[in-house]
Amino acid sequence: MKKALTILLVMLLAVSLFAQGAKESSGITKSPFSDDVEVRVVALKGPTAMGMVKMMDEGKYTFSLESAPDAVVPAIVKGEVDIAAIPANLASVIYNNTGKVEVLGINTLGVLYICGFGDSAITSVDDIKGKTIYASGKGSTPQYALETILNSLGLVDGKDVYVEWKSEHAECVAALASSNGSALAMLPQPFATTAMMQNKDIHILYDMNDAFEAIAGTPLVTGVVVARKDFIKEHESAVKAFLEDYKASVEFVNSNTKEASELIEKYGIIKAAVAAKALPYCNITLITGNELEKTLSVYLEALYAQNPKSIGQKLPAADFYYL
């Protein structure tokens, strides 16, 4: 178990996409579910937590929010929480190292965008060639998505383009701002929106999510929601109820921008003004059942072909998916 946890924590160093800059975790304690079954849910501040705010406000579940994955993985592995929203490839790593989790659904599709100065969209190789691209999230979804797109365009890092990896999204924005328009930055939502609100000259120039899907034949999958296998076995009715409530919450967030943004700020995720502008670009969803297996398995196969380590050295077995 210690060895498995060590491997998982090493993987977490690269999973920065979900952390949105807060330094401390914030716990949101809600009342127990029903029939003496307390459903404990943890999510990372960002798009996955944004899709859950209606559930947080209804009070059926015990929620906690974290700023970084290193607090989430040990909690789900040790049984301190029952359900967790985590990066898609990390779910596969946990499964392959412990066998203790099952994926309930995909909750976030692509949130990556290439940003730069000006408002001229990137439409050809020449718009990227020779430029520096500042990026964060090396070793996780951002790196694999960027490499897939660059390879499809015939661009070689270090020769045709120059990818400079940063540890935080804020560093990418600062580097972009000091480039005098000569560089680009790969940013996730809602951070891309925050950057644009801080600097009116920065714009989204390229949608990496559409590009990845066109190339790989599968959507870019950012996040999933997983549950402990033991919890599913013991309380499957509670899991099914959770998924119904989650679906309703996602529909509410995607259909009621103003009200959802206010709840997003209420629970300390991001400011309402940022959320209102970012929500249309966050690709918050809930894909379950056969469509979950079809979409996620193809995505993990694409990652495996690039780097087996990114998903835990092997493709997950059928019992990885809750159908």
Where are these regions (language model features)?
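Short, glycine-/small- and polar/acidic-enriched structural segments
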Residues: 27-156, 163, 183, 189, ...
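Conserved C-terminal helix/tail region of periplasmic/extracytoplasmic solute-binding proteins
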Residues: 297, 301-323
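Sec/Tat-exported extracytoplasmic proteins
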Residues: 56, 80, 85, 95-98, ...
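Short acidic active-site motifs
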Residues: 71-72, 168-172
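Short, low-complexity disordered leader/linker segments with a strong preference
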Residues: 1-38, 62
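Pocket-lining segment of extracytoplasmic ligand-binding domains
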Residues: 88-90, 171-263
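Short, surface-exposed acidic
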Residues: 157-161, 268-279, 311-317
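Secondary-structure end/capping motifs
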Residues: 232-306
